[in-house]
Amino acid sequence: DSVRDNGEDYILTRQAIVDYIELYLRTPADFHDSRFAPLIATSLADLPRTLVITAEYDPLRDEGEAFAARLDAEGNEVACFRMNDGVHGYFLYPSVLSLVRDTYRLIAHFLDGDPLPKPGDRPWLTLLGTD
């Protein structure tokens, strides 16, 4: 569980997540609104081509990857990449410039309309040429 494993000492903490949720919610009923939590939507079918990028040490990693898996299961065109050694918001930190550069290259491939990898492919190596 990424919240348990990465919810302390990696910039975004478990408590900060709770605090942000409380700031975002208008009423407790929002917890049951798929606009607040897309994973609870009855259907995620027929959504646009989607790129999901998660970070290895992000407490929200599992949620992002579950969203990508659900999009895939419902027939959407989706690719999901976990950025090794990344923390929540890593692309804002110049100390991880090579990781940021790779992330932007991945986004550029997606925006250019390059084909998304199929399950079982090695998309990191294919798209970024880092073999």
Where are these regions (language model features)?
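Alpha/beta-hydrolase superfamily serine-hydrolase fold, recognizing
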Residues: 1-131
